[in-house]
A protein has these predicted regions:
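Polytopic alpha-helical membrane-helix bundles and their juxtamembrane interface segments
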Residues: 1-212
Length: 212
């Protein structure tokens, strides 16, 4: 990774630390500035990374952009959870497309990831879906579809065979599952801070994946 990309990732890391602090302290004004800066820094890093595949880079940048929209939507005072989830869903679809674009996916790694995802999700997913069902049919359907797409993202990230993508996919799955748990079941250990930490680490991982 070149100097420019490294500096931008480092700056994104600093913004992330500020964001996590603001979330823990419930400083919404600081969070409103720091949270978008994390993803903006990572978008810049993705654009600066030396990679021979411009299409995959473009898809990752677009996914980061969709995630940025979701972050901003969920921070607004009159935030609509559905709109934020839709933006994140678009980000997942773009990441999935990027993985498929690379070709040569490792079936063995994908199967292993699928088994792990099913095992981990066995306890949490039914409770999240049950909680979403109480919010109405639209929310129930939206959350169910989102969880399925999230699982596919993690599965295909593992199937790339790249360690950075594997870890990033697992972290993104964890982040979104925690978000759903906090929203529809109960406050998860670490609350919103852990959601942010895992989410930001996942996006960093996908940017690093571009260099592999």
């Amino acid at each position: 990774m070149g100097t420019t990309a490294t500096v931008l990732v480092a700056l994104a890391g600093v913004a992330a630390l500020v964001d996590w602090w603001s979330v823990a302290r419930e400083r919404l004004g600081v969070e409103f500035i720091a949270k978008p800066l994390v993803v903006i820094g990572l978008i810049g890093a993705a654009l600066a990374v030396d990679t021979g595949d411009g299409v995959v880079r473009g898809l990752v940048v677009a996914a980061l952009g969709a995630s940025l929209v979701g972050d901003v939507v969920l921070m607004t005072p009159d935030a609509r959870f559905e709109a934020g989830v839709f933006a994140f869903l678009v980000a997942h679809v773009l990441y999935i497309t990027a993985f498929l674009e690379t070709g040569g996916l490792d079936v063995g790694a994908g199967v292993a990831a699928a088994v792990l995802i099913i095992g981990i999700g066995f306890g949490a997913v039914p409770q999240i879906i049950a909680g979403a069902r109480l919010r109405g049919p639209a929310m129930h359907q939206g959350v169910t579809v989102s969880l399925a797409v999230i699982a596919v993202t993690a599965l295909l990230a593992a199937a790339t065979g790249a360690l950075t993508a594997m870890i990033a996919g697992a972290l993104l799955l964890t982040s979104d599952a925690l978000l759903g748990w906090n929203r529809f079941v109960d406050r998860a250990p670490g609350g919103r801070v852990l959601v942010q930490v895992t989410n930001h680490a996942a996006h960093v991982g996908f940017v690093l994946w571009l260099t592999s």
